[in-house]
Structures are given as C-alpha cells and as structure tokens.
Amino acid sequence: MSSERDLVNFLGDFSMDVAKAVIAGGVATAIGSLASFACVSFGFPVILVGGAILLTGIVCTVVLNEIDAQCHLSEKLKYAIRDGLKRQQELDKWKRENMTPFMYVLNTPPVI
C-alpha cells in the first residue's frame, strides 16, 4: 500500500509540475517575443528581453502554485490517479474471474 501511495504521489506531483512548467514556458515565450519586438522597435537594450522572460517565469510559477493551492488541483489529480488504479485492479480481477483464459489473453495489453 505504501509503494502504491508513493507512486500516486510521484505521478500526481510530477504531472502537475510538468503542466505548470509548460504553461509558464508558453507565457514566458510569448512575453519574450513581445519584449524582443519592443527592444528592436524602440532601441531598448536587448538584456531587457532576458529580464522580461525571467520575471514572467517567476510570476507565472508563483501564480500557478497559488491557483494549485487554492483549488487543490494536485490533490484532485492524485485522487483521480488513485481511483483509476483501483478501478483498473477491479477490472483485471473481473477479467480473471469471468473470462476464459483465451479471451483473457486477448484482452490483456502486452507487457513491454
């Protein structure tokens, strides 16, 4: 049970952190493009682009962590993963008990 809980925590935290990083990266890229255009157009120093990207990434990360904390998104994701694993185990048990061995083999995904 402990290893399953650790797996669920790892998958939930990792998935949520990747989603936050993708969102923050996309927003920072968009802001960086706009800052680059402004620097080229108005003659500002190009170092401002890096600062804008860094500041945007930090702000996005803080905002996304706050949204996660307020809406409990990580906990909901972990609950959904835990529920999905439980349902998968129930389905596998039903298949073992109710299907012929031939059909069970046909309906079992290959292990890679």
Curated annotation (Swiss-Prot):
Q: Which UniProt keywords apply?
A: Cell inner membrane, Cell membrane, Membrane, Transmembrane, Transmembrane helix
**Organism the protein comes from:** Escherichia coli (strain K12)
Please list the residue ranges that the record places on the Periplasmic side of the membrane. 43
Query: Topology relative to the membrane, per the entry?
Result: Multi-pass membrane protein
- Topological domain (Cytoplasmic) residues are 1-21, 65-112
What GO terms fall under cellular component here? plasma membrane
Mostly located where? membrane
Tell me yes or no: is Transmembrane helix among this UniProt entry's keywords: yes
Protein name (database record): Putative inner membrane protein YafU
- Regions crossing the membrane: 22-42, 44-64
Which domain of life does this protein belong to? Bacteria
Compartment(s) where it occurs, according to its Swiss-Prot or TrEMBL record: Cell inner membrane
